[in-house]
């Protein structure tokens, strides 16, 4: 079976399932599809790494962090647009994430309209690759 890119699939990677639901419900409410993962390792082992049009990821997770995931994907030549959402961000983390090509770095709690705007910007970016 060949892997096909899906321009409407958003991957969400957060170790807290309850915090996956908020962006998942919001994104699905505008007709986009989502897949949720509880760790960077789960995302890397899935076909979503090749299919998703963008990735929403938490910075701090057990095992591989969101920043480490971003670096690994970049090193492998994967150009999936990444949106970071975190409750534990600081200016240094933001600088690292944005410097490595993140679409945005949002702090929890985030504004729903802002997240949707950023997701649409990420989807546009992925369509231009």
Which ranges hold each PLM region?
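Receiver (REC) domain active-site loop signature in two-component systems and cognate sites
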Residues: 61
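Acidic catalytic/metal-coordinating carboxylates
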Residues: 38-39, 65-68
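Acidic, metal-coordinating helix/loop segments flanking the phosphotransfer/catalytic sites
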Residues: 36-54
């Amino acid at each position: 079976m060949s892997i096909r890119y899906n321009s409407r699939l958003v991957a969400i990677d957060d170790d807290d399932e309850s915090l996956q639901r908020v962006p998942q419900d919001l994104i699905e409410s505008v007709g986009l599809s989502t897949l949720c993962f509880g760790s960077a390792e789960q995302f890397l082992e899935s076909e979503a790494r090749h299919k998703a049009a963008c990735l929403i990821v938490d910075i701090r997770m057990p095992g591989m962090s969101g920043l480490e995931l971003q670096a690994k994907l970049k090193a492998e030549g994967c150009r999936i647009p990444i949106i970071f959402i975190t409750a534990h961000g600081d200016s240094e983390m933001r600088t690292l994430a944005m410097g490595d090509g993140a679409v945005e770095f949002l702090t929890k709690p985030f504004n729903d309209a802002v997240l949707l705007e950023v997701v649409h910007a990420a989807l546009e970016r992925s369509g231009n690759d």
